Design a protein with these regions (language model features):
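N-terminal Sec/SRP start-transfer signal
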Residues: 1-32, 42, 48-51, 309, ...
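C-terminal membrane-exit region of the final transmembrane helix in multipass inner-membrane proteins
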Residues: 13, 364-406
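Internal alpha-helical transmembrane segments of multipass membrane proteins
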Residues: 22-24, 265-286, 324, 329, ...
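Hydrophobic secondary-structure segments that place a key small or acidic residue at a functional site
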Residues: 97, 110-117, 132-204
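Mechanotransmission and gating elements of multispan inner-membrane complexes involved in transport
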Residues: 170-268
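Short helix-loop junctions at transmembrane helix boundaries
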Residues: 313, 328-374, 388
Length: 406
C-alpha cells in the first residue's frame, strides 16, 4: 500500500520529479566518473614516476641522497644486490653509480649528475632506452659511449658523434678524474630537470672513474605485485635498511606525488560532501513542495484515522522512489561515460608536468565495484535523511488547519 501510494505521488507532478531525479542522477554520475578519473590519474602518475626512472623503490647508503658523497656507496653492495635480486617479492633489481661532475664541450661547461648503468638490465626497469630521440642506446662493450638529455645537448651545442670531457673527483682521494666520451644518444624523458642535467655511461667505466671498485650507490627495484607498489611492504624496506643502508619506496623518494594523490582524495571527499548537500536540499525541496500541494489530502487522511506513522512512512517511501530512479540514471550515465573515456583515453593532459612528473600517456578512468555500490547507497541514505523533516511535518499535520479553505 505504502509503495503504491509513494510511486503514484511521485508521478503526480512528473516534471518536478524528473528534474529532481536528473539533479540526483547526474550528480551521482559525475561522482562515479570523477572517482574513476582520479583513480586513473593517480595510477598514471605513479606509473610515470616508477616506470620512467625511479622504480618502485631504491636502496642507498644513509644520507647519500642528501650529501651525494662518492664514498657513501652501499655497504656490502654486491651481497645486498644479490639478496634483493633473489627476494620473492622483487621482480627486478638493477645497480647504479651516481656522481656529480662537470661536462665540457667546445662551447660550454656545465654541471651534471652522472649515472653509471648496466645498459642491458637498465632497459628492463626504466624508460631511458625508449626515450632516445637521436642516436642509439648504450652498448656495454663500448666504454666511451654517453647518453645526454636533449636540453643538455642544446646547451652544450653538441649532437650525435661529438666528443665531450667529463670531470669528477674520485672517492677517498679527491683526485680529479677526466675522461673523454662520445655522444652516442640523446634522450628526451619529458622532464626538464632530467633532460637538462643527467648523463649516462656504462657502469664499469663509472666505477673506474669514481674509484669505488665494484661498489655502487643505488639499487633500483620493482615489486612483483601491483598492490605492493601502492602500499610498499614496510617489512621489506626495513629488511634492507640495515648496516647503515636505507631502503625507500617511491612515496619517500617523490613525496610530492604521494601528497598529490592524497590531495585528490581529499578533493573528492569535499566534492562529494557538496554534491550530497545539493542532493539533500533538492530532495527536501521536492518533498516539501509536494507536501504543501497535498495539505488538504493529508488532512482528510488524518481526519479519517490514518496514523501519523503511516504518513511518515509514505513520505520516506517517496524519497526512496526518487533515490531509486536517480540511482538507475546515475549508474547508467556514469558507467557509460567511464567506459567510453577508458576506451578512448583522455590525451589532452599528455606531456603536462604535474607535481614534478610528466603525464606521458593518456589518462584512462579506472572503474571499481565500490563506485557502483557505495555511492548509490549514499544517495539512498542522503534521500532518507533529507526526507525525515518533511515526513515529520506531514505526520504532525492538524486536520482542522490543513482542511481549512481560506
Amino acid at each position: 500500500m505504502i509503495k503504491k501510494l509513494g510511486f503514484r505521488n511521485i508521478l503526480r507532478n512528473r516534471r518536478r520529479s524528473i528534474i529532481t531525479c536528473m539533479i540526483m542522477g547526474l550528480g551521482l554520475a559525475a561522482l562515479i566518473f570523477a572517482d574513476a578519473f582520479l583513480h586513473g590519474l593517480n595510477q598514471n602518475m605513479i606509473t610515470s614516476v616508477t616506470d620512467s626512472f625511479i622504480g618502485d623503490g631504491q636502496i642507498h647508503r644513509k644520507d647519500f641522497l642528501r650529501t651525494r658523497e662518492l664514498e657513501k656507496s652501499i655497504n656490502d653492495s654486491e651481497n645486498v644486490f644479490k639478496k634483493i635480486s633473489e627476494d620473492p617479492k622483487i621482480k627486478l633489481a638493477v645497480p647504479r653509480t651516481i656522481a656529480n661532475g662537470m661536462i665540457a664541450s667546445p662551447t660550454d661547461v656545465l654541471p651534471i649528475a652522472l649515472y653509471g648503468i648496466n645498459a642491458i638490465e637498465e632497459e628492463k626497469i626504466s624508460s631511458i632506452k625508449n626515450s632516445i630521440k637521436l642516436g642509439s642506446y648504450l652498448d656495454n662493450s663500448d666504454p666511451i659511449q654517453l647518453l645526454i638529455g636533449d636540453k643538455l645537448a642544446k646547451f652544450l651545442g653538441v649532437t650525435i658523434g661529438d666528443k665531450v670531457v667529463i670531470t669528477m673527483a674520485q672517492a677517498q682521494t679527491g683526485i680529479l678524474s677526466q675522461e673523454m666520451f662520445r655522444v652516442s644518444g640523446i634522450f628526451k624523458m619529458k622532464n626538464k630537470e632530467m633532460d637538462s642535467s643527467l648523463a649516462f655511461i656504462n657502469i664499469n667505466k663509472s666505477q673506474e672513474m669514481m674509484g669505488i671498485g665494484n661498489n655502487f650507490h643505488e639499487i633500483v627495484f620493482k615489486f612483483k605485485n601491483k598492490s605492493d607498489v601502492l602500499n610498499p611492504p614496510s617489512e621489506l624496506l626495513k629488511l634492507y635498511s640495515e648496516n647503515d643502508n636505507e631502503a625507500l619506496s617511491w612515496k619517500k623518494l617523490v613525496p610530492a606525488i604521494d601528497a598529490g594523490i592524497q590531495l585528490t582524495s581529499y578533493s573528492l571527499y569535499i566534492g562529494s560532501f557538496i554534491l550530497f548537500a545539493i542532493i539533500a536540499l533538492s530532495t527536501m525541496n521536492t518533498l516539501f513542495m509536494s507536501l504543501y500541494e497535498r495539505m488538504y489530502e493529508f488532512g482528510i487522511m488524518k481526519a479519517i484515522g490514518t496514523r501519523p506513522l503511516f504518513i511518515f512512512k509514505l513520505i520516506i517511501m517517496e524519497a526512496c522512489v526518487l533515490a531509486f530512479f536517480s540511482s538507475l540514471l546515475g549508474i547508467s550515465v556514469g558507467g557509460i561515460a567511464t567506459i567510453v573515456t577508458k576506451w578512448i583515453g583522455i590525451s589532452h593532459l599528455t606531456d603536462v608536468e604535474y607535481l614534478g612528473t610528466t603525464i606521458k600517456t593518456a589518462i584512462r578512468p579506472i572503474p571499481s565495484l565500490t563506485q557502483y555500490i557505495v555511492y548509490p547507497i549514499a544517495i539512498f541514505i542522503t534521500a532518507i535523511l533529507s526526507s525525515i523533516y518533511p515526513a515529520i511535518t506531514a505526520a504532525r499535520i492538524i486536520p482542522s488547519k490543513s482542511m481549512r479553505r481560506d
